[in-house]
Amino acid sequence: MRILTVVLVLISLVSQAQEPEVDKVRLGYLKNETTSEQVGMAASPDGTHAAFAFRDRTVKVFDVKAGRFIKRFTTSFVNLFDMQLTNDGKLILVEGKQIEIIDWKTEKTLTQFTTTFEITKSTYSDRNNLFAVGQREGWVEVYDLKLLKVINTFQYKKHHVSALAFHPDGKKIAVAVMPLLKEMNPIRLIEIRTGNILVESKKGFYTMAAFDEKGENLVVSSLNTFVTKASIEILNGTSLALTRAVDGKVVWGNNIMPNAGRVSNGKLLAITASRSFNVYDIDAGGIRFTTKSDGIKISGFMSLGVGNENSFPLGNSGKFLINSLGNNINQIYDIKTNAIVGYFFCDSNDDFAVVSRDGRVEGTPEALRKVFWTSIWTSRLSNQRTPLESTFESGFTPRLLSQIMDEDEKTQLAKTTFEVEKVIDKIPALQLKSVNGAAAANGTASATQKQSKVEIAVTQNAQEVTEVKLYQNSKLVKVIPGNGKSLYGFDISLTNSFGELNYFYATASSKSGVESEKVKFTINYKGVTEAKPKLYLVTIGIDKYKNPKYNLNYAQADADGVANVINKQSKSLFQEVVPFSIRNDKAIKANIFAALNQIKTKALEQDMIVVYYAGHGVMSSGAEKEFYIVPHDVTQLYGRDDMLAAKGISASDLRNFASDINAQKQVFILDACQSAGALDALDRGAAEEKAIAQLARSTGTFWITSTGAEQFATEFAKLGHGIFTYALLEGIGGAADTNKDQRLTIRELSTYIENKVPELSEQLKGTAQFPSAYSFGNDFPIAVFEK
């Protein structure tokens, strides 16, 4: 957002008779590692989508229900002033003298409007499909968003527009302008169709205006002549007569004047010029909430009434998406509980993270690493930052933003705030002690022997450790239970399958469920060059189940297709491709375990394993829910946890195999569909995502899943395969080699599938299906192509 400002940086320790509620959770992020600074955001009024704009001109659109970004494209704005998102897919971008309206689904510009003067204020009415901008020299222009045309242009002949608000009836608009020298000006209520002045308020310096839901009141913020006092005032929505004043503060105190806001349920939600978000009670008076969370108040830059709102309702949930600081962390405010209940971080690349006030998290691996809880008041001497990934095992929650929106007041109040100081004080801290008995300066060491030993020291809170885990080249290689001691020794086997450097990190789990910060180190292995790797390829496809009502349409064809294309495109990478083809009635637990056990005994560190499964996938229904893939002889998917335990293959089973198999390049691809008629398919899908994501991170392996979509025969008729596997086969066949270097890496493949499957499913089924890819391991090639 661009604003005209006068600099007024003042610090004061102002006390108040009654302090408002404050945001108790503190988040930070590694700004030097972000791709681009966020410069704008908006949410559709129905709460289904949110859009974010970045300094590098990228715009991304987030699907709240799906819990992921579904669109990213580049625009032409240079200095974004405001943005709005409509329910019918229009994105409105405002800067300088330009308004651009884009259909974000097609990325096409629908129209552009050019104003005479620079835009200083804008406002949007979803109810009436109207948009308006105020400009320098008092000009106002109103647009019909349905017809994409100008309705009227008129001028308040005084100065720059400083406040602008549509009346809920869509026929009138309130306009205020900045004072010229000492001359104050009234707010005018103007008829949009004619431009006629209907009524004026008393004179003042107005920086914000917002009608309540019925148009009975107009809430405004104003400054006095000497710019030393800011007030919130309630005007009659028809006569603009002053009804009452809500709040008055000296400008260098806790809260200076709002320059943007909206009224909801008797509250004014305002973004202030002190770069805070405040909630004012317009009935009882006073400030109910502020994001200013400490006694030292830094006012920052005082706006002269030029700026725009960054608070958007998320449908009828009572939650609002806000951004007062102008950085990459957005907040979710709940008006019913009067609290920040969540946070949303995003970057212009693929990264995003969602955080709830009770410590639940969701997001991409890089975002969960870059965003952290922090506290300047902790007693700890080190490890001040606790990245979100530290709570992945205990707190990962797919589609978290949707959950936060759906949680009612009772549920929200029952949630406990994540108490940063208490948690950070008890997190263990680790340090690399030695490699083969010698100290490793700066976290680096060299070794010629393949079998080596490392020691990890716990430097703080050793009694809190429940286990210490060691990862090699991002794959889990060993877990040692916590014993209260301060030193843990690991026997390791070095490899040059990724080159001479072996990358390690260790982390300690704690009693609080939060992991320590990773201690990272490298060992340069100068031993004997290893033999060319082998590929162990396990493909499982089950069309015919023992219970015929679970039969599928094309699981066998999908498994056959995957086996053929990987064998064809991967041969030159490997000394040998060792296939395990398990189909239909042969696909029982004993046979699948036998194949994986055989690989466990033979695979070396430099080898690769790919496991592909096409069949049913379910969550158990007991208290300890677990994800299962369903072999041929399971005859009841739901309500028989004993049968699943006896004949199914659980996430825990897969985790054990992934950990025990030496191969450090592991890929698991699951096209595990839901059975038709599963009433709680959405909940089951989220639970499966959580189980697989935690499995992927805990083992450091790659997982690509279809997220439990139901199979349809029409997919096979048109594609010859299911949608997910069709995209997979296209990708491995060469379509996913986006940089055209004739080598396909696993990250390139997963990105292609995540983008292609929604496109295909919307074309064939009318609704988008979103696969999930969890890539916590190192990237590596899976196929090569001849020129």
State where each predicted segment sits.
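Cysteine endopeptidase catalytic domains of the caspase/legumain-like
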Residues: 371-787
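Beta-strand-rich domains and repeat architectures in extracellular enzymes and scaffolds
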Residues: 30-57
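Repeated scaffold domains used in trafficking and secretory/extracellular systems
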Residues: 38-40, 79-83, 118-123, 159-164, ...
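Residue-level detector of Asp-centered blade-edge/turn motifs that repeat once per structural unit
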Residues: 45-46, 87-88, 126-127, 168-169, ...
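Eukaryotic protein-protein interaction scaffolds centered on beta-propeller repeats
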Residues: 18-40, 249-253, 290, 327-433
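Hydrophobic beta-strand positions that form the internal "hydrophobic ladder"
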Residues: 50, 91-92, 131, 173, ...
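Short glycine/acidic-enriched loop and turn motifs that connect beta-strands
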Residues: 57-58, 138, 179-183, 224-228, ...
